[in-house]
């Protein structure tokens, strides 16, 4: 019985670590996308100023 509980706990721990790793990867993608949007937004503002429409 104790061995079953230990195995279940180990499995739950492994699943939790896998989920945390996946969430970390998702967060990384979100941060990268936000940075890209900020770069694009900055570029658009610069172009608007250069064209006299901003």
UniProtKB/Swiss-Prot annotation:
It is a lipid-anchor. Keywords: Cell membrane, Cytoplasm, Lipoprotein, Membrane, Synapse, Synaptosome. The N-terminus is blocked. It is found in: Cytoplasm, Perinuclear region; Cell membrane; Synapse, Synaptosome; Photoreceptor inner segment. It comes from the Eukaryota. Its main location: cytoplasm. One of its GO terms (cellular component) is membrane. SUPFAM superfamilies: SNARE fusion complex (SSF58038). Belongs to the SNAP-25 family. t-SNARE involved in the molecular regulation of neurotransmitter release. May play an important role in the synaptic function of specific neuronal systems. Associates with proteins involved in vesicle docking and membrane fusion. Regulates plasma membrane recycling through its interaction with CENPF. Modulates the gating characteristics of the delayed rectifier voltage-dependent potassium channel KCNB1 in pancreatic beta cells. Part of the SNARE core complex containing SNAP25, VAMP2 and STX1A; this complex binds CPLX1. Found in a complex containing SYT1, SV2B and syntaxin-1. Found in a ternary complex with STX1A and VAMP8. Interacts with HSC70 and with SYT9, forming a complex with DNAJC5. The interaction with SYT9 is inhibited in presence of calcium. Isoform 1 and isoform 2 interact with BLOC1S6. Interacts with CENPF. Interacts with EQTN. Interacts with HGS. Interacts with KCNB1 (via N-terminus); reduces the voltage-dependent potassium channel KCNB1 activity in pancreatic beta cells. Interacts with OTOF. This is Synaptosomal-associated protein 25.
């Amino acid at each position: 019985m104790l061995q079953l509980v230990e195995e279940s706990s180990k499995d739950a721990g492994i699943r939790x670590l896998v989920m945390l790793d996946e969430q970390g990867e998702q967060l990384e993608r979100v941060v990268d996308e936000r940075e890209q949007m900020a770069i694009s937004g900055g570029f658009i503002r610069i172009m608007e100023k250069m064209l006299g429409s901003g």
